[in-house]
């Protein structure tokens, strides 16, 4: 049914302040968003903090989805780190003497190309209800927090420092006053931080610290150097001695520390030493591995060379009750002979493991955090209970189809590609079983074929393209890039070796970006464009491809230095996660002019072609103020105007966290910055133009979602009921007019019916009140399936029932000065809707029922029968 809007204003008094003074984030808070999950694949857990006196209460720290708390052993979780300045967590610690005191170190401790950064240390005195930032804001990544066993004011923080560049605020820090002040106890240099710190459980003056020299660049990773080492202090950190007796000579990579709780004379470490990493290298071929000391680190013996992918999560854990039982992370494995041999059991959980906790009172009780959430075991990690209610999925890309209800397609970090409904017709909402897996690996963009809605183009890492028929289950690999024009292998082995050109090693896979770009042409439904280092075009749905040229600088990354030297085969964790460079990162076409193409790369080139890729013009220099070698992240050609396009660029991979967003009106010949008043340091990820209002822009950043109603002159954060989040992608549904948001840490969020945002303007904001257009509504007879599911059961939110009615109040008014009435086509009063009288944007729901004249008021009010389908009018009246 359709509902029109009508506004009646009585006794108006208008003032005309500037737009910039009026619009605020608070003004938009009346537009609620809903989180639909998913939780079926969960997401990356980086640390655990368990209350030992009550192990049913524990906290889970996520890579980019904040902190979650359970008080019932995982049956249910609540988010407790929602509105801070960051979403990324590296470490968490709970004070065992006073479990109300929590410490959180922000910024992932992994070194991924997708790792997010934080802004220091936070502390809570009320079990996570409120938080205070207590310093070390420029440390960016926190590896571990060690707390004094009796003095709640004493803590040690392992600050890793910037991942993408040098900085000073790194090393081991110490506070004796609860975080009011900090002293740096251990510092090597601007390239080296501290990744781990451990305190002797019997003597808090004895500390072990692992220093870690590492640097990631757009073109590679160097995970070690002379700064890495193992240190010990016996005077609470005042002085330090490097521990080397029995350890190998040479440079180290990452080191993890575990002290045997029942006998602190015994210490285990995992030690990385240089070895070229590629995905086909067996883990046990690496140098170094697991070491043990029986005399508090004075001497060491090599137990085994087992150390799975150390740059990511190299961390041993010795069972607090059994010296012979050692667990290792990244690839979950255990040893029953003090680390001489390891068993890596076939898991029913995710295989990329980050953290493990063993109950000191019962070693059978184990909790594991990995890239797929949390598992709990009661038999020492053999059988697992998977926690199914944590919606912390990390989306890279999102797309929608035109089904009813429409479906949402997306790719996730280390959890493949999935599709699920935007709503269901059941009271339970959107459930885990509503989501269907489309592909494996790391998932990225998934697009529905415009000719056949049962065909989906799915993508995994490094442009791993395939064409999937949802009805038959048939999948055809269509990755471009084979030098002879055939379909390139879709596997992601690193293709570099000494003296062997990258494209010729192994399976001859062409270079492709981690998040390889592709799109289906707006002008021809059978045409696809996709980028490796070359831009490729297919006119037969990906069955064959033609090259439109290598659009990178073609630089040889082996000639590029990291931390002042060129990497070599012995470099620790060489190029982990970046097997190819340079590559294309963004491609798009003008929606009005066939053959007008835009292409951007990870080595900083922005090029345009007006002849479908036959010739290219490098227009990078036209983007004023843009540093060299920036990452071209997203193009957004205008749906309204030919020649207009937007680009979102970021440069954090060069340790630059400024905002770079631009607009062209002439097919890329000239560009104008539209950074406007966007708060500093947000880092642009994606930008979209509204399909109905050319002045309305949506900007997804590493820290927050922003809108502009004047094409980028001014920006305001749209947060409402969402936590602090990274927004990697977004789309506006062309039929339902919903804003669909892909977050890298909390799944998918939806703002239903963005009519109010589309109709906002400086003129509207100057009015005393405004009633916005109302989308069609329908009566849904929801199914109540009454299943006995228990409470460990995630339920994504359905849209609120009824007609969504949005209105704006410039100033607050008295409660009796505002009314909202519903009339039928004959002008008869149907219902009166409860309103809110405070200033700002508001959304209220009409439940599509007649008013019950005998129902009473307040909480006892009962609704009348449903209205008949037809046309209705909403009338907002404001007196003032």
Predicted regions, residues:
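Bacterial N-terminal signal peptides that target proteins for export
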Residues: 1-7, 677
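Bacterial N-terminal signal peptides
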Residues: 7-17
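Beta-propeller blade termini and top-face loops
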Residues: 21-793, 800-803
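Surface-exposed coil/turn segments at beta-strand junctions on protein surfaces, enriched
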Residues: 250, 262, 640, 798, ...
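Beta-strand-rich binding/interaction modules
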Residues: 466-468, 805-806, 813-832, 871-875
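Glycine-centered tight-turn motifs at strand-turn-strand junctions
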Residues: 627-628, 829-866
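Contiguous beta-strand segments within globular domains
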Residues: 784-817, 823, 843-845
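C-terminal tail/sorting-segment detector
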Residues: 878-880
């Amino acid at each position: 049914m359709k509902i029109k809007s009508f506004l009646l204003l009585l006794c108006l008094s208008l003032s005309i302040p500037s737009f910039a003074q009026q619009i605020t984030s608070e003004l938009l808070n009346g537009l609620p968003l809903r989180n639909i999950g998913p939780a079926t694949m969960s997401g990356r857990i980086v640390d655990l903090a368990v209350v030992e006196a009550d192990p049913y209460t524990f906290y889970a720290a996520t890579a980019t989805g904040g902190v979650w708390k359970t008080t019932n052993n995982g049956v249910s979780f609540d988010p407790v780190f929602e509105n801070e300045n960051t979403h990324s967590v590296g470490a968490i610690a709970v004070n065992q003497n006073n479990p109300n005191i929590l410490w959180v170190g922000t910024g992932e401790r992994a070194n991924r190309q997708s790792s997010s950064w934080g802004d220091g240390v936070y502390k809570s005195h009320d079990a996570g209800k409120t938080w205070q930032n207590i310093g070390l804001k420029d440390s960016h990544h926190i590896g571990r927090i060690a707390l004094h066993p009796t003095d709640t004011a004493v803590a040690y923080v392992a600050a890793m420092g910037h991942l993408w560049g040098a900085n000073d605020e790194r090393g081991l820090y110490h506070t004796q006053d609860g975080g009011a002040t900090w002293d740096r106890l251990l510092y090597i240099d601007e390239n080296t931080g501290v990744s781990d710190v451990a305190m002797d459980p019997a003597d808090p003056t004895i500390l072990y610290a692992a220093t870690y020299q590492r640097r990631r660049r757009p073109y590679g990773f160097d995970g070690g150097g002379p700064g890495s080492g193992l240190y010990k202090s016996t005077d609470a950190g005042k002085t330090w001695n490097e521990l080397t007796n029995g350890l190998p000579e040479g440079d180290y990579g990452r080191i993890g520390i575990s002290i045997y709780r029942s006998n602190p004379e015994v210490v285990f470490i995992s030690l990385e030493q240089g070895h070229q990493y590629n995905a086909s290298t067996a883990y046990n071929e690496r140098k170094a591995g697991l070491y043990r000391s029986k005399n508090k680190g004075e001497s060491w013996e090599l137990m085994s060379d087992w150390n799975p992918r150390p740059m990511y999560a190299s961390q041993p854990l010795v069972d607090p009750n059994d010296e012979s039982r050692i667990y290792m992370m990244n690839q979950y494995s255990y040893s029953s002979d003090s680390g001489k041999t390891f068993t890596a059991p076939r898991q029913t959980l995710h295989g990329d493991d980050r953290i493990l906790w063993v109950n000191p009172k019962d070693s059978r009780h184990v909790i594991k955090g990995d890239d797929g959430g949390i598992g709990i075991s009661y038999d020492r990690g053999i059988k697992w209970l998977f926690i199914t209610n944590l919606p912390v999925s990390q989306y890279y890309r999102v797309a929608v189809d035109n089904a009813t209800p429409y479906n949402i397609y997306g790719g996730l970090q280390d959890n493949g590609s999935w599709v699920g409904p935007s709503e269901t017709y059941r009271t339970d909402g959107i459930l885990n079983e509503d989501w269907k897996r489309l592909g494996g690996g790391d998932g990225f963009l998934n697009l529905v074929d415009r000719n056949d809605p049962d065909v989906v183009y799915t993508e995994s890492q490094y442009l791993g393209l395939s064409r999937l028929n949802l009805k038959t289950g048939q999948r055809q690999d269509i990755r471009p890039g084979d030098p002879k024009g055939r379909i390139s292998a879709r596997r992601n082995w690193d293709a570099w070796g000494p003296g062997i050109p990258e494209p010729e090693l192994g399976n001859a896979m062409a270079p492709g970006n981690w998040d390889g770009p592709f799109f289906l042409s707006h002008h021809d439904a059978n045409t696809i464009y996709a980028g490796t280092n070359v831009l490729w075009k297919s006119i037969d749905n990906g069955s064959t491809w033609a090259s439109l040229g290598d659009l990178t600088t073609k630089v040889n990354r082996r000639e590029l230095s990291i931390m002042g030297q060129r990497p070599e085969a012995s470099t620790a964790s060489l190029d982990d996660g970046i097997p190819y460079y340079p590559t294309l990162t963004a491609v798009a076409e003008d929606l009005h002019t066939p053959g007008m193409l835009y292409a951007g790369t990870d080595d900083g080139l922005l090029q345009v072609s007006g002849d479908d890729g036959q010739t290219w013009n490098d227009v990078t220099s036209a983007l004023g103020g843009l540093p060299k070698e920036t990452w071209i992240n997203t193009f957004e050609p205008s749906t309204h105007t030919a020649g207009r396009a937007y680009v979102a660029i970021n440069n954090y991979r060069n340790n630059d966290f400024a905002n770079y967003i631009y607009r062209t009106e002439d097919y890329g010949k000239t560009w104008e910055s539209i950074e406007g008043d966007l708060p500093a340091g947000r880092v642009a990820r994606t930008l979209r133009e509204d399909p109905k209002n050319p002045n309305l822009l949506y900007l997804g950043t590493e820290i927050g979602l922003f809108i502009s109603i004047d094409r980028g002159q001014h920006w305001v954060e749209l947060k409402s009921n969402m936590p602090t989040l990274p927004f990697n992608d977004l789309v506006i549904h062309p039929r339902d007019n919903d804003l669909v948001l892909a977050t890298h840490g909390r799944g998918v969020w939806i703002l239903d019916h963005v009519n109010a945002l589309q109709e906002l303007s400086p003129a509207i904001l100057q009015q005393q009140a405004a009633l916005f257009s109302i989308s069609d509504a329908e009566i849904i007879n929801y199914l109540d399936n009454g299943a006995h599911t228990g409470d460990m059961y995630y339920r994504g939110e359905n849209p609120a029932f009824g007609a969504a009615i949005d209105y704006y109040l410039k100033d607050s008014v008295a409660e009796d000065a505002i009314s909202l009435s519903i009339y039928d086509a004959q002008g008869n009063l149907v219902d009166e809707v409860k309103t809110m009288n405070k200033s700002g944007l508001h959304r209220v729901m009409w439940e599509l029922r007649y008013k019950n004249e005998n129902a009473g008021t307040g909480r006892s009010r009962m609704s009348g029968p449903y209205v008949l389908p037809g046309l209705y009018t909403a009338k907002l009246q404001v007196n003032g």
